[in-house]
Design a protein with these regions (language model features):
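Short beta-strand-to-loop acidic/aromatic patch adjacent to the donor-nucleotide binding site
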Residues: 28-42
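Active-site-proximal specificity loops/subdomain of glycosyltransferases
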Residues: 1-27
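A short secondary-structure junction signal
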Residues: 32, 43-47, 81-85
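Catalytic core and acceptor-binding pocket of nucleotide-sugar-dependent glycosyltransferases
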Residues: 79-187
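Short glycine- and hydrophobic/aromatic-rich loop-to-beta-strand nucleating segment
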Residues: 69-77
Length: 187
């Protein structure tokens, strides 16, 4: 594939292809991942730990789709090559316009039941006043057993007076409610 574009943001469309592109370099590793440069890490062990790595094939930090800014995939043939199941993948990665393959079509391949969950919420739960994220937290573990979709609220939009703490010495980040965060994402 001939890939060279003047806009660096277009590189984000290659994220689902990282496992395939770096297949040789990944030999001997259990997981491969994708991330953004605008993250400040705290305790990433909240997300990536022995328990989660033993139980899940994909670990991500949103509950409504794969978080392209922080996602880890088991290093096996299935997840390395899932990107090639994206419809018209060659034309999408060679088109100049970014199309967010990581959080869009690839996310739908990793988590095929998210569409069903959206429909359950839209047609049933929202009329009962049940928040979409509550429905996701209930149904994701049932419908996506091998994927940890957990919302960490790492892309804040702090309001005046809120205090967020980044403790460099201890490698920890605490939001204004006192919750520990694995990282902060500056959008």
């Amino acid at each position: 594939v001939d890939y060279h574009y003047p806009q660096p943001y277009k590189l984000t469309d290659l994220k689902p292809f990282i496992g395939a592109i770096h297949h040789e370099e990944l030999k001997g590793y259990d997981f491969w991942g994708m991330g953004d440069l605008d993250l400040v890490y705290g305790n990433l062990g909240m997300v990536i730990n022995d328990k989660n790595m033993a139980r899940y094939d994909v670990i991500t930090t949103h509950n409504y789709h794969i978080a392209g800014h922080c996602c880890f995939c088991r290093n096996n043939d299935y997840y390395r090559n899932l990107c090639f199941k994206i419809k018209d993948w060659k034309s999408k990665i060679t088109d100049e316009k970014p199309v967010s393959l990581d959080e869009g079509e690839w996310s739908s391949l990793v988590c095929p039941n998210l569409r069903t969950i959206r429909r359950i919420h839209y047609y049933v739960c929202r009329h009962l006043g049940i928040h979409y994220f509550k429905v996701l937290d209930l149904l994701n573990p049932i419908l996506h057993r091998n994927v940890l979709l957990h919302e960490y609220w790492t892309s804040p939009q702090p309001k005046d007076g809120e205090q967020w703490i980044y403790d460099v010495k201890n490698g920890s980040i605490t939001d204004y409610k006192g919750r520990s965060l694995p990282y902060l994402h500056f959008i």
